[in-house]
Amino acid sequence: MKFTKSLLLLIVAVFASSNAAETFSNFQVTNSDANSPCVTTPVELKVNTCQSACGSILNVLPVTGSTSKFTFNQFGAQDTKCAATPTSSNEFTCVDGKSKVAIGTTTYSVVCVPDKTNSSESDSSDSTRIGASFALAASVLLSMLAI
C-alpha cells in the first residue's frame, strides 16, 4: 500500500511540474553595439535557423534535455549557412524572459518569446495559471491520499 501511494505521489508531482514548464522557439535580439543594424529594432531569431542579424550571422540551439537553456552562436559574416564552427558562443537560460548574452566582444539582449500551445492563450501568464491549476489539483490529491 505504501508503494502504491508513493508511486501515485511521484506521478502527480511529475505531471504537475511538466505542465508548468514553458518552451521557447523564438527570441527577440538586440545588440549593444551602436553600429549594429538592430540596436533600436529587435530582430526575431528562430531556434536552429541561421540568420543574418545585428551585423553578424547568428543562431540559437536548444540544449539537450532542457526547454529553457539555449546556446547562442555567432558565426563569421562569410559563413552565411553556419557550415563551420561558430566564432563564439554562449549558453543562456530563459528564466525571467530576458537575458544579457555576451558572445565574443558583443553583448546581446535576448528576450525569450514563450511558445503558444493554444491559440486562445493571450500571453505567458496563461501557462503560469495552467501550471498553478495543476499544482493545486496535485495538492488536493496529495491531501486525499494522506487521509
Curated annotation (Swiss-Prot):
Residues 1-20 form the signal peptide. A lipid is attached at residue 118 (GPI-like-anchor amidated asparagine). Its main location: membrane. GO terms for molecular function: actin filament binding. Residues 119-147 form a propeptide. Transmembrane segments: none annotated. It is found in: Cell membrane. Keywords: Cell membrane, Glycoprotein, GPI-anchor, Lipoprotein, Membrane, Signal. It is a lipid-anchor; GPI-anchor. The GPI-like-anchor contains a phosphoceramide group, rather than a phosphatidyl group. It comes from the Eukaryota. GO terms for cellular component: lamellar body; membrane; plasma membrane; side of membrane. Glycans are attached at residue 118. Belongs to the ponticulin family. This is Ponticulin-like protein C1. The lineage of its organism: Eukaryota, Amoebozoa, Evosea, Eumycetozoa, Dictyostelia.
